[in-house]
Amino acid sequence: MTRGSTSQSVLSSVRDLLPEVAAAAAEVDRTGVVDRAVITLLHDAGYFALLQPPDFGGLDADPDIYLTATRELSSACMSTGWLAGWLAVNNWGLSVRDVRVLREIWGADPRALLCSSYAPTGRLERVPGGFRLSGRWARCTGAPYASWLSVAALKVGADGAAQDFMAVLVPRGDYTVQPTWNGLGLRGIGADDVIVTDTFVPEYRAFSWLDMVPDAALPALQRLPQPTLYTLAGTMPLLGAAHRALHAASDAHVTARADVELSMMQIRRNVAEQLDCVRGERYPDAELMLRTRRDQVMAADRALRAVEVVVDDAGIEPDEPLLERIWRDVQTARMHVASNVEQVLTVVGRHSVGIAVDDLIW
């Protein structure tokens, strides 16, 4: 990224990389590795700076630029788009944390990347000056590419009972990456397990997930509700893969194309409305949050169905490795919690008839 780069110039630079990314997709699938040189090229293009805070070299971009770039990367190679999208959104998640940890991470290395898992499979115990952390987290996308880890853990009291749901930041030297990822698809995302054993975590690196409220002085991008971009990070790759499959299809598949286009329109509308809320110093209400989550999960489902329609019509033949790979990738991506259609629509339905709902799905 050059001085004076804009978010639109970043999108243009990412598009320039797409032929190279697409040409490498079969090799990524075969070896299970996205070349680190591609990550460097995405850094150079400014992709990972899109969601970084301005005080640390970020661009404070319109989130639609990030969503579009991630979708187009995924159209070229879904493993690359999924990996890059999650590494980038973790930059955004970090941006609302204590400024001391931002300085610790990006002050030392402006290109530092984080992997994450927010399944609360860790245990935090209070000690002087902070906590002791132990745990194991499965399927942390990008673990081999990251120099920091962001994970969820339950803070427990002296009696062992859970007291809080915390997010914790851990440097690379304090955790172990166990190479376990061997998915049916998305083979290049490096979603390995990470292990932390009785590691000290300073107070400023641990945050209450339930009580976290972004500073009103932060840019609007950083004040978007946390679930919004995190769930979309799991959906843009599916939409990108669907676009590629439809483009490769010999038939028109008009309905499937319309469904994918509709999904992008709904996503853009919802994110724009959330931005309007935070710019007006209002938190998006339950109606908007649930509609955003509904449309996001339906977009994931429509993308999956679009790929299945193409594959069902064409069949998966030995001379169609592209469709075969895309099919495996989307079947793997659908397993992510962000794409749990039944859970989300059940909650939306309960809310629509006046039943109280658990807002953690937001």
Give residue ranges: language-model regions.
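Glycine-rich flavin
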Residues: 34-44, 48-146, 163
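Glycine-rich beta->alpha junctions and the first turn(s) of the following alpha-helix
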Residues: 183-265
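Amphipathic, non-membrane alpha-helical segments in soluble helical-bundle scaffolds
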Residues: 7-11, 32-36, 228-239, 253-264, ...
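Amphipathic alpha-helices that form helix-helix packing interfaces
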Residues: 17, 235, 242-245, 249, ...
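A short core secondary-structure module
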Residues: 139-177
